[in-house]
Amino acid sequence: ILGYLPQEFGLYPKVNALELFDHLAIMKGISNKSDREKLTKSLLSQTNLWKYRNRKLGTFSGGMKQRFGIAQALIGDPKLIIVDEPTAGLDPTERNRFHNLLSEIGENVIVILSTHIVEDVSDLCGNMAIIKDGQVKVVGEPQALIKELTTQVWTGLVEKKDFKNIKKNHQVISSRLSMGKVQIRVLDDNEPIAGFSQTSPEIEDLYFATINELDLKGKI
């Protein structure tokens, strides 16, 4: 059985959590009232929502709604759960709480996480894949993949007027404005530009290098 939490899902704002969860359990085929009551208490407790069961869903915070979404995804004891952008828009406290919840669930259920937030991958995933245009480009353990880029990532500040030419002649992983200049990260076996320093690779480097189709042959 498959459980699914989409990035955006509708909740009836004037219905309380207990009522909607019971309704969803019925829709998923749990017809026995006693079984539904036990399941509802178990899953709402697991997601730390039991004490809020009588509150209307329209009063829930973004993180509480996400936790309710995970609870409903667990109805029916699924063996696989797909979670789409679960921490998008959450504040740091709720993101941390949600990470802990997913880690706990992942001990007993296979969780497939679809996300653009690199912290989700580094904190939660034992295995990862980077997909572009429907094709899997990279797959493996996050830390092992990052380790392959050790000594390959360089960083430095350049003038904005020089950036275009540098990007043309070097494998620029990513760039951002900093103090009126451009802070760039470059993929190279050797010091690409005088004054650049070697830096520890991050998952974000792997992601941008893959998406930007930089030459990773021999590195990954």
How would you describe each model-predicted region?
Residues 98-185:
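ABC transporter nucleotide-binding domain
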Residues 8, 14-27:
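Q-loop/switch helix immediately C-terminal to the Walker
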Residues 22, 26, 34-52:
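Conserved ABC ATPase "signature" region
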Residues 77:
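Conserved catalytic motifs of ABC-family nucleotide-binding domains
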Residues 70:
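Hydrophobic anchor residue at the start of the ABC signature
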Residues 56-60:
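Conserved ABC ATPase signature
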Residues 81-84, 90:
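Catalytic Walker B motif of ABC-type/P-loop ATPase nucleotide-binding domains
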